[in-house]
Amino acid sequence: MARINLRNHLLEMDFEDVVCFSNGRELRAHLKLRDIDLLLMDFHLGQHKNGVEVIEEVQKAGLIKNSTSIIFITSDRLPMIVGQIVDVHPDALIIKPYTINSIKQNVTRCLDLRHFMMPILKQMDEDKHEQALITLDEMLKESENPRKNSSLVKLRARILIKLGRYDEASKIYKTILKGSDKIIWAKWGLIQSYHLNGQVEESEALLLDMTDTQLTNDKACEWLARISIDGNQYGKAEEYMEKIRDGELSLNAARLKAYIYQAQERGSEAIELLEKKRESNRGIRERFDELSLDLARCYLNEAEGKASNERDDKLQVAKFLIGSAGRKVADPQLTVKKDYMYALAALLEGDKKKANEILARPGMDELEGADLPTMTDAISAWQTAGNKVKAIEILKICQQKLAAANDSNEKTISAMLVAKNEETIGEKKPQALAYNKEGLERFVKKDYQQATHCFYQAYLLFPREIAFSLNLLQGMVDAEVVKYETIDTLRFLKELERRQLTPGNQKRLDVISAKISDNQEIFGEQTDAPSAE
């Protein structure tokens, strides 16, 4: 009823073409057919994904243009909700209850600004960002309207980031923050500029400041966790994610936390987290289906780590979850996604004939519009089925997509999955084994410094291989090194203590840990285990 009333009011304001949608699926279907000039989006969409999730999806799919104005409407004043809305850069935010006059003012203002900036926005839509910047600078010289100038400066920083001119973007954000250090979008822009420019320490310092306020804590912790993952510091990443209450974890944040658990061989905790999240979203079918597939991946991963005669229970649960996802939805992409997971399950069951039958189904080669997790499933399936050429072909497409993806939880998760595929089919493993072999030879000769160097190179190529990690820690301890390159000894020990190890590896880690404790004069200065830089 609220949508119909709003539509009627817009028609009364002389808007001729006004279309209503009840959920994101309806909007996506419409956007595939025609463009929209202005989108008024409510945050709460009933038993469907919320407005922010919908906007993120259509932006990622390229269904919404830079020239489309977005106005968010919500009755929710919670910092967590407002923060999520601000993150998608709407042109305006209207808090309910609203008046028709306030709607009219906001819509008119957004469309006026859109018309003013259209020459720039059209060039951005055509991916002509260099030309868009030239046009923007010309308009900035001519404009005398402070409000429009402010929007132009904000857009200029975004274009500079798109062009990889991070230092120039940083200067803009710093100038804005000098005027007021409470402009949140400028803080996020500065953090992004620093991060993309490789200034990790600067971005981390700003992010730590952002954890002090409720409005920005969750996003800052997620970002800090991603930075930690980039440095293979999964224990540290987990600590940041623990600062977000489970009930306030977004869908992508829950996925990120689950993959952090899996990276530490703690699959049971990943399953427990995703099961809770899935159950709490039972009433929101789209999220429920996605979480069912995420959970199925966890069970497939757990089954892969077991002996072939111990996989049945995990595989049965995985297949049930795959089948339950989108049961009533006719979506070709979802069908392909599920079929690749079914193929993996068949391969883990040892039924290669069934797997090949699934892989031969129509549409299984059509991965252009597939998401990265589906593509990594496809790589694993083709590789395990014996078609390494096909697996490498998809891996290359995957790497290109990953390079072009925006920095986000999803990109970090996908990078972890792609890295796993690279380890399986790439050239890294033989090289890592060669470094490890040389390291062992030097270690036997008590050349601990050079042994540590070799173990470190093997670790960089295969950071999740526990043998390489233990060898590196052993080398550092015997070389009496507090820190080697990016690895801090005590922080690294803490990381390894979080992982689920075999009895043999656990015994070895205990011996190394005892040796560190016996050498307090060397390692005692860093009892707080500061993070690697």
What are these regions (language model features)?
Residues 111-165:
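CheY-like receiver
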Residues 5, 80, 98-107:
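C-terminal output helix
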Residues 42-59, 66, 478, 482-485:
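Conserved phosphotransfer microenvironments
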Residues 1-20, 25:
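Two-component/phosphorelay signaling modules centered on CheY-like receiver
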Residues 20-38, 46, 167:
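Acidic, metal-coordinating helix/loop segments flanking the phosphotransfer/catalytic sites
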Residues 52-53, 66, 76-92, 105:
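Alpha4 helix (beta4-alpha4-beta5 surface) of REC/receiver domains from two-component response regulators
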Residues 167-389, 393, 398, 411-413, ...:
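Flexible loop/N-cap segments at domain edges
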